[in-house]
Amino acid sequence: FSDGEPITIDDVIFSMYVLCDPTYDGGATLYAQPIQGMAEYRSGMSTMSKYLGELGEGSTDFSVVDEATQKAFWDAVNDGGVKFAQEIVDYMVANSGVAEGDVKSAAAGWGFDGLADDATAKDLFLAIAAKYDWNFSAMEAETAGSALSDLLPADVYATSTKAVTFGESAASITGIQKTGDYSMRVVFTEVSATAVYQLGVVIAPMHYYGEKDKYDYANNKFGFDKGDLSHVRSVTTQPMGAGPYKFVKFENGTVNFEANDSYYLGAPKIKHVNFLESQETDKLNGVVTGTIDITDPSFSSDTVDAIQQQNSNGELNGDKITVNTVDNLGYGYMGISSVAVNVGGDPGSDASKNLRKGLAT
């Protein structure tokens, strides 16, 4: 790693267990793979938000979470959660021709089809929560304006990373097996087409993100207490890895990196590299003025024209700017505005939908 500590298979196993912890709230989905013992390891424990969400409002079961905490949770859902969903509805009304109060159509346009005709903003929020397993951090992706973290009380928002135990669970994932200091085996219960991609986990330094005194593979200790990733989260603002550059600091919209002298291929020749947060409109101008060395603007006709105007030879490669392009395999799609393309001013009518289908067929 960039601090000179050698990498071993324990770092890989630690990283996998973090990604498979019931309270993990990041974007990786290794836990969804059919790995032997995964279900048994994750059973009997979940985040408090998922537990309360699935328990439901008005529950009288206070054996795991007390009544006051449950009430505070649902009060937050009925206030901040509803506001979060209402912003989506309002956005769809303002921009997509959805009728005022038509939550069902607004939700469908946002990717949540199947709500009842008389659906409310709360119903939409519950649908969003179900999609993301009540992971408030992941639900932020659905925002139409406000951050969910600004709409929910901090203690309620934190329930999506706080563990609750309500049953028995296995102490380890039997399919994750250490076979040596630099080797391991992962056992699947069935064929998984995506396994080859999911197993490519980023190897995080256990001695930094975890706690070394809590790692003992033979005794089912994997660098942290199951259900408690607080130490992992506490150092994520100062990341450490094993790449060619190491993180120095982030301030004023700039990430500062410096060469990693411990990099396995040798230290990079460029000692310092800075990444700047940039708006699309500032990228090309930054290169022209010299505040940015390299950037990746959207390669539109306007950008091409602007580059050619800056170069004295009127080409994409000249005395001021050099352009490197690559071919990408991909696909795109066209969208049709229901506000602009409809029959009789009613974007939601069957005739309007058929018109748009006809144009797209």
What is the meaning of each model-derived region?
Residues F1-L148, G286, G348-G358:
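Aromatic- and charge-enriched surface segment that lines or borders ligand/interaction sites
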